[in-house]
Each structure stands twice: as C-alpha cells, then as structure tokens.
From Swiss-Prot:
<dbReference type="GO" id="GO:0000407">
    <property type="term" value="C:phagophore assembly site"/>
</dbReference>
<comment type="subunit">
    <text>Homodimer. Interacts with ATG3 and ATG12. The complex, composed of ATG3 and ATG7, plays a role in the conjugation of ATG12 to ATG5.</text>
</comment>
<keyword id="KW-0653">Protein transport</keyword>
<dbReference type="InterPro" id="IPR042523">
    <property type="entry name" value="Atg7_N_2"/>
</dbReference>
<dbReference type="GO" id="GO:0000045">
    <property type="term" value="P:autophagosome assembly"/>
</dbReference>
<comment type="function">
    <text>E1-like activating enzyme involved in the 2 ubiquitin-like systems required for cytoplasm to vacuole transport (Cvt) and autophagy. Activates ATG12 for its conjugation with ATG5 as well as the ATG8 family proteins for their conjugation with phosphatidylethanolamine. Both systems are needed for the ATG8 association to Cvt vesicles and autophagosomes membranes. Required for autophagic death induced by caspase-8 inhibition. Facilitates LC3-I lipidation with phosphatidylethanolamine to form LC3-II which is found on autophagosomal membranes.</text>
</comment>
<feature type="active site" description="Glycyl thioester intermediate">
    <location>
        <position position="578"/>
    </location>
</feature>
<keyword id="KW-0833">Ubl conjugation pathway</keyword>
<dbReference type="GO" id="GO:0006914">
    <property type="term" value="P:autophagy"/>
</dbReference>
<dbReference type="GO" id="GO:0042752">
    <property type="term" value="P:regulation of circadian rhythm"/>
</dbReference>
<dbReference type="InterPro" id="IPR042522">
    <property type="entry name" value="Atg7_N_1"/>
</dbReference>
<dbReference type="GO" id="GO:0048511">
    <property type="term" value="P:rhythmic process"/>
</dbReference>
<dbReference type="InterPro" id="IPR006285">
    <property type="entry name" value="Atg7"/>
</dbReference>
<dbReference type="GO" id="GO:0000423">
    <property type="term" value="P:mitophagy"/>
</dbReference>
<dbReference type="InterPro" id="IPR000594">
    <property type="entry name" value="ThiF_NAD_FAD-bd"/>
</dbReference>
<dbReference type="GO" id="GO:0006995">
    <property type="term" value="P:cellular response to nitrogen starvation"/>
</dbReference>
<dbReference type="GO" id="GO:0019779">
    <property type="term" value="F:Atg8 activating enzyme activity"/>
</dbReference>
Length: 709
C-alpha cells in the first residue's frame, strides 16, 4: 500500500561529531491515489497549478519502522481531521499533465521555492506563532490513468548549516537521563499543553525541568521562559524517528530557526526528541532521546540557505518512484473509473459544459432486445448509463448472434435463452457496474386479441400493469421492436406519464430515429389553455416551414398515419414478416437513437426543446453537442440523412388527447377494447373514420366537377 524508504535504516557511524538526521520516507495510501484520480478527472483536468495538500507523521511507531510522512485519501481536504496523536504537515502538490513534463520539471527551482517560504516564515517570526510552517513538503506527480501507473517524487525541504551541527553530548535514551518522576511529569505536561492548544500532538515546545517537575510551553512564549535556568535551554521536538542515536527530519528546520533567532545569545541547546509509543496498552516515552548540540552563530546572511530534501527512490538513487495500482485496486472500481475516463476527458477541453450526471443517471428502458436493442444498449454503456432494462418475449435463434452483439452461439442451444434475460446478463459481464435487468414478457398489441379465455385476459392485464410500472420507473423509453403495432401501447403509456420516448425503426436501407413529442404536465394543460397539445392558428405561425416547433407540439411515431395500427404480420410471407435490412443499418440507427437522447438531455428544456431541422445545420447549435432534431431519416443507398419535423396530429391513434383521455379514465378496459377490436375502433374514436369519409366525399365532388367540364 505505502511506498516506504529504507534509507534511514542505515545511518552513518554514531561516533561522528556532526549531527545526522534520519530522513522522512513517503507513505502514500491507495486511497490517496484514488482521490487524486477523481480530482484529476473531475476537477483539475488540465490545470497544473500547485494545490495545497496535507499529510501527517507519527512519533509512536514500533522499533524498526522508518520515519514516515503519510498521505491518505483526505490529503486534499486541508480541514479534514487526522488520526489522533499525529502531527500534521502541509505541502504542495504539482500534478503534471504529461510524463514528459514530469521528467523535465525544474526540481531545483521547486525546492528553492519551498525553501524560501520556510526561510521567510523564520525571518518574519511566523514560524514561532505557527511551528507547522517548518515542516513543509512538496509532491511532484504524474498519473497515467489508462494504466493506473502513478509516478511521484517527494521532497522534504530542509535548510542547511554551512558547516553542519556539532554534537556536544551524544544522544542517550530519556530513561537514562530522567528519573521516573521527571518522565511522568514530562508526559503530563505535554498532554496538558496539547489540551490547552486544542490538538493531540504538538510539533515543537520549550522545556524546563527540575528534580521532580517539568514545565513545557509553546515556542512563542520564549521570552522569559528560561530566566531561572541559568542559561540552559531545552527544546522538545515531536520526533517520528525510532533510531537510538539520530533525530528525525523535523529537527533540521527548527535548528535553523533557533540559530537565526537566538544564536547570538546561546552557545548550545539541549534537544529532547519526544517519542510516544504505546505497547500492549502501556504508554512509554522512555525511548525518547536527549542530547546537546553547539548552536552555530552568525551562520546566515539575508538570503535563504542552501536546501536539500528530494527523496531517494527504491534503488537508493536520486529519482522518482512509481506505483502500479492496476492489479491491487478493486477490478470493479477500476472498470468504473475506466468507463468514465473518456467521458470525463470530453469535459477537459472539447465540451466543458457537458453535464455527464444527466446522462449517467438516466434510467433507460429498452423495449426490444434484438438487433436495435443490442446496439442501443452498447452505446448507452459507452455513455456511462448505469441503469438499463430490457423487455422482450423472444428467444435467441441461430441467426441472431452475428447481427446482435450481446449474444453468442451457446445462447442459441436448447431452444435459445430468453433475449431480455440474456442481454441483461451479458451487460453485467461486460461491465459489472451496470444495473441491468431483463423481463421476458409480451406487449399486448392492437389487432391481436387477448380475449380467448380468462387466462389470456389475466395475462394481458398483468403484462400491461408490468409495462406501466416499468415506464413509470424509467426516464427514457426506447421503442426498438419489430412491428409497428407493438410500439402503440408503450407510446400511449409513455405519453400519459410524460416520459421521453426515443423511437428507432428500420427498412431495408432506410431508417427513422425520432423523439416523440413530450406532452406538457397535466396541471398546465388543464389550468391554462395555452398549453393545449392541439395546435391553434397562432401555434402554426411559422410552423409551415417546420421551424421553431417546441417539443410539446412534436408528433409521435403514429402521427403521420391515417389508419390505426393492426396485425401487420397476417398474410405475410417470411421476408415480409422478418426485418430484412442491410447489416450495418441497425448499428447506425441504434447509435443515432442514443446520441439523440444525449442531445435532448443536454438541452436546458430537455424533451420540450425546439426541434432542429435540416435548415438549421448552418445555424448556431442549441446545445454544446449540436442540434436537437425531431427526426433523423437515413438513406443508406445515398449515404444521406435528413432532419424533418412534424407536428402532433390531433387525430393520432397514440398521442391525441382523445386516446390519452380514454386511457387515463378507463385504463385496461379501454386497452382491451383496442386489443380485441379491429382498427376501426381507434379510427372511430380519434375521428379518422370521419376524415376518411370527408376525403372520399371530396374526391366524389372533384370527379363530378371533371365530368361536368
């Protein structure tokens, strides 16, 4: 999990007269890299400006552990709490966009910049008020989010004395210098200081001790604190190091502070490296070390001293480290992050205003799990949609797998698996993060009687109720069935429930993809006549050119029909019963159906968006993704598409006010009449029968006029 250096395990000879320090080792939790990934994708994007982050270090590790500076998932929230009895350290993150930038970055300049900030805090006295300013770090990173390889290089800036620091008294354990009473008094005094300051760990503090008493105080209370000590000065440092002869890295910058502030009045200073370990429930600070050093005088000018601090890599050389998380991260979370990667990259530069949440959170119901259904499902997954539900009553046949990419040869055996169930199962195998369900059920249709028996009527009632529940539970309904009449019932239910409907249908080398007009909310229709779905004279102003037609006045799949839907498979040959089309057509139409949905969702008015037509191709697009058409009609023989717009028909057999009113008032009783009757029932209800009669009468009058002439 954490990358830890072992270089502090091999210190120099303790007999050296100059003080040596055990450097920090970086310890980056997997949660840190996961959070960096999310920040990079969703927030930073191409931004390379420095970011403030927070880590912590601990002075209670068991013997043998290196001095670690830890960064967790909460490192990006500087106000987040850290574990108890740990000391915070603030740093700067430099996250680069490319590996080349990471390699060529001026490390010397970055170190000097951080060192100058520490030096300025020392000169200004800010470090006395806030000692945490002495423990800064910087982190240079590059995240390869395709492979989940993370390159990083830590730096712990430490200012240096020109001639080093000479040791007067070598480090010894606190238990060898202090009595038991003094140790207990020190522990109590330190706890009281932390409680007074409202923290659980304090990085630097002043100490004065007598035979049986110890007093500690913050650095800012230096003046007058040591007046009764006869020139003896002792300071405490919260020390993450475990070595018995060497202090940890946090002492370095403090000694620079001490030399700059008090070097002219002090010749030496006693240092207590405070280490606070709990073993088997017993707290122990006796392994802390205490020693005396000679404090250099006049060692600095106005300029920042030389600084060091770049961490060595695992091989012990000066270079970055790399961590490969592609294998240790949860495969499902990896899949989710990877699925979202390309989508979020769109927002970086190409489409900054793209609202991915609207797309990802859309719950999609696919009525039909055949050639169109498979293509639509795969494209929806490409857009990151997490909720996909299939409805189909067919089983997978041997002709299906080559045209329907969610199925395999094994799915055809033993009579074939139910398409809806197999499609839902396959989506979860492709991407475990998708919530896919399948319903193996029939959709009752006009002209297909269900009144053969009580059993068939009960089954039809159950199927209608299930379909109503499914449409109610989803945001977008895709009509992808083979026959025209099978689209009628879901078109009626979706229109009544004000759901967005995307329809796709195929010919041999032609297709139509369209969005149904989205009716205004019922309270607006009843409360204000201007929201009537039937277009009045003022509504049609300019509509003859099929421009500026709002979404609630757009027609549905049945609005261009002058006959009611019926049994289209009766008395048809095999080639007329099956959908015979060019193999690539379904993938084109399926992709366009999903892209139309996405464009509608990105429009501020959603399904009520004004329809774009072919005439709008040269105009300013209404969304960041371009046009929002009503229909897309494609002609593969000419490799051409057109974008027609049509108004809602007040005599439509699916979305007209008369049909919706009858459905909402009578429910299944009305639907049963449609299923069990001929097409004349819907035509009589909507006025199509009268329209036919008027048309025939007009033709008779025309013929009479011709004969007279």
């Amino acid at each position: 999990m954490a990358a830890v250096s072992n270089e502090s395990q091999n210190p120099v000879d303790p007999g050296s007269s100059k003080l040596q320090f055990a450097p920090f080792s970086s310890a980056l939790n997997v949660g840190f890299w996961h959070e960096l990934t999310q920040k990079k994708l969703n927030e930073y994007r191409l931004d390379e400006t420095p970011k403030v982050i927070k880590g912590y270090y601990y002075n209670g590790d068991p013997s043998g552990f290196p001095a670690r500076l830890t960064l967790e998932y909460s490192a990006f929230d500087i106000n987040a709490s850290i574990p108890a009895r740990c000391c915070p350290a603030f740093g700067t993150l430099y996250n680069t966009n490319t590996f080349e930038t990471f390699k060529s970055c001026d490390k010397k300049s970055l170190l000097e910049k951080e060192a100058n900030e520490i030096w300025e805090s020392i000169k200004s006295g800010a470090a006395l008020e806030n000692p945490m300013l002495l423990n800064r770090f910087l982190l240079l990173t590059f995240a390869d989010l395709k492979k989940y390889h993370f390159y990083y290089w830590f730096c712990y800036p430490a200012l240096c004395f020109p001639d080093g620091i000479h040791v007067i008294q070598k480090p010894v354990c606190l238990g060898d210098r202090f009595s038991l009473n003094q140790i207990q008094a020190l522990q109590k005094a330190y706890d009281e200081l932390c409680q007074t300051e409202g923290v659980t760990a304090f990085p630097y503090f002043l100490i004065k001790y007598h035979d049986n008493s110890v007093v500690v105080s913050p650095l800012k209370k230096w003046d007058g604190f040591f007046q009764d000590q006869g020139g003896k000065v002792t300071v405490g440092v919260y020390d993450p190091c475990n070595l018995s002869h060497y202090p940890g890295w946090p002492l370095r910058n403090f000694l620079i502070l001490a030399s700059h502030k008090w070097g002219n009045i002090l010749q030496s200073i006693e240092v207590l490296c405070f280490r606070d370990r709990t073993m088997q429930g017993v707290r122990d600070i006796t392994h802390s070390i205490i020693f005396e050093i000679k404090l250099p005088q006049g060692a600095f000018g106005p300029d920042c001293p030389k600084a060091v601090g770049w961490e060595k890599n695992q091989k012990g050389g000066m270079g970055p480290r790399v961590v490969n998380l592609s294998e240790c991260m949860d495969p499902k979370r990896l899949a989710e992050s990877s699925v979202d990667l390309n989508l979020k990259l769109m927002c970086w530069r190409l489409v900054p205003t793209l609202d991915l949440e609207k797309i990802v959170s859309a719950k999609c119901l696919l009525l039909g799990a055949g050639t169109l259904g498979c293509s639509v499902a795969r494209t929806l997954m490409g857009w990151g949609v997490r909720k996909i539900t299939f409805v189909d009553n067919a089983r997978i046949s041997y002709s299906n797998p080559v045209r329907q990419p969610l199925y395999e040869f094994e799915d055809c055996l033993s009579g074939g698996k139910p398409k809806a169930l197999a499609a839902a199962e396959r989506l979860q195998k492709i991407f475990p993060g998708v919530n896919s369900e399948g319903y193996n059920m029939s959709i009752p249709m006009p002209g297909h009687p269900v009144n053969f028996s009580e059993v068939t009527m009960a089954q039809a009632r159950k199927d209608v109720a299930t379909l109503e529940e499914l449409i109610d539970a989803h945001d977008v309904v895709f009509l992808l069935m083979d026959t025209r009449e099978s689209r009628w019932l879901p078109a009626v239910i979706a229109a009544s429930k004000r759901k967005l409907v995307i329809n796709a249908a195929l010919g041999f080398d032609t297709f139509v993809v369209m969005r149904h007009g989205l009716k205004k909310p019922k309270q607006q229709e009843t409360g204000n006549a201007c929201f009537s779905t039937a277009p009045g004279p003022s509504d049609l102003l300019g509509s003859s050119l099929f421009s500026n037609i709002p979404g609630y006045k757009l027609g549905c799949y049945f609005c261009n029909d002058v006959v009611a839907p019926g049994d289209s498979t009766r008395d048809r040959t095999l080639d007329q019963q099956c959908t015979v089309s060019r193999p690539g057509l379904a993938m084109i139409a399926g992709a366009l159906a999903v892209e139309l949905m996405v464009s509608v969702l990105q429009h501020p008015e959603g399904g009520y968006a004004v329809a774009s037509s072919s005439d709008d191709r040269m105009n300013e697009p209404p969304t960041s993704l371009g046009l929002v058409p009503h229909q897309i009609r494609g002609f593969l023989s000419r490799f051409d598409n057109v974008l027609p717009v049509s108004l809602a028909f007040d005599k439509c057999t699916a979305c007209s006010p008369k049909v919706l009113d009858q459905y909402e008032r009578e429910g299944f009783n009305f639907l049963a009449k449609v299923f069990n009757s001929s097409h004349s029932f819907l035509e009589d209800l909507t006025g199509l029968t009268l329209l036919h009669q008027e048309t025939q009468a007009a033709e008779i009058w025309d013929m009479s006029d011709d004969e007279t002439v």
